[in-house]
Amino acid sequence: MPEDNLYDISIIGGGPIGMFAATYAGMRSAKVQLLESLGQLGGQPQALFSEKTIYDIPGFSSISGKDLIRNLNTQLQQFNVDVYVNSPVLNIQKTEKNQFKIITNNRISYSKSIIISTGIGSFEPRRLRIANAEALENDKLFYTVNDPSIFENKTIAIAGGGDSAIDWALELNTIAKDTIVIHRRNQFRAMESNVDKLKESGSKIMTPYTIDNLSTDNSHNNLTIQLKKVRTKDTVELSVDALLVNYGFMSNNSILKSWDLDLITTKNNLIPVNSKLETNLQNVYAIGDIANYPGRIDLIAVGMGEAPMAVNNALESLYPEKIQPKHSTQLVKNIKNNENN
């Protein structure tokens, strides 16, 4: 086995939590690789919410998904981390040396420990289940927003009742001519403070309604949305320029089933971990939204705290004789001293 292909830590999943875990592992002078199945790092904030404003990142009153990932990438590049994108992990096997053989679609590597940070796994939006919806995608019907400017001075309908729907309604309300929020319940599931902002924003709120049909006129300029009021026969028609559907995302973590991990199958194959973020497999850790323990909540801020914990616990298990520096100042100073020697 070539030594340059053997890592102290392999991090599977290149979303924001995996990126910071790789950064911290590099800061600890570990030999580390970061494996990401998509063509770019960043996970959901980069692929799905690049223009969405995030308000619960420590140190930032607000930051867009793309800016968060850009900052994390700048931080990552300060340290010696091997990054592989377009590299979905197909299998993990235990070797006779009590190490891990990691097989991706394009290479084989070995690792002394693994940190899983796959989040919700591979994901795609929950789509409208009506006959002609697919034909309207990326024209009048959208599930993600890559460029908010296309909605400038337009009448936009946003369907959904969770955080994403309300966040986008507030965001687009600043540039759109009119915004209309459609939800099948009278109560929203989004953060209460944002729901209050929505009610004060001037957006039109249509509850409890479901989308029954979509159609366009001959010129294809306007989209007509037929709404049906829940538990009644009442219908309403809306004429808008575009519809943004935020019904959440379907995820797939089924690949984890082949890795001998204990999984909570009733919770989308989440991985139970202990207070050290250890899984049932020795030297395998889980962090971020894929990890499960009592009281955990799915916030980027929570995962950011788990990242250095998992790295430190992994290195302590591998190299118990090494003294762990307490502060990043000393860690970076040590790296610079080694580079100068």
Swiss-Prot record:
Entry's EC annotation: 1.18.1.2
What GO MF annotations does this protein's record show?
Answer: ferredoxin-NADP+ reductase activity; flavin adenine dinucleotide binding; NADP binding
SUPFAM superfamilies assigned: FAD/NAD(P)-binding domain (SSF51905)
Q: Which cofactor does it need?
A: FAD
Question: Cell wall biogenesis/degradation: present as a keyword of the record?
Answer: no
InterPro entries assigned: FAD/NAD-bd_sf, FAD/NAD-binding_dom, Fd--NADP_Rdtase_type_2, Ferredoxin-NADP_redctase_2
The cofactor note from the UniProt entry for this protein is:
Binds 1 FAD per subunit.
Q: Which residues does the annotation say bind FAD?
A: 36, 44, 49, 89, 123, 289, 329
Q: Which reaction does it catalyse?
A: 2 reduced [2Fe-2S]-[ferredoxin] + NADP(+) + H(+) = 2 oxidized [2Fe-2S]-[ferredoxin] + NADPH
Tell me which UniProt keywords the record has, alphabetically: FAD, Flavoprotein, NADP, Oxidoreductase
Is Iron tagged as a keyword? Answer: no
Broadest EC class assigned to this enzyme: oxidoreductase
Q: What quaternary arrangement does the UniProt entry report?
A: Homodimer.
Family designation: Belongs to the ferredoxin--NADP reductase type 2 family.
Family matches, as HAMAP family: FENR2
This protein is called what?
Ferredoxin--NADP reductase
Species of origin reads: Ligilactobacillus salivarius (strain UCC118)
* Taxonomy of the source species: Bacteria, Bacillati, Bacillota, Bacilli, Lactobacillales
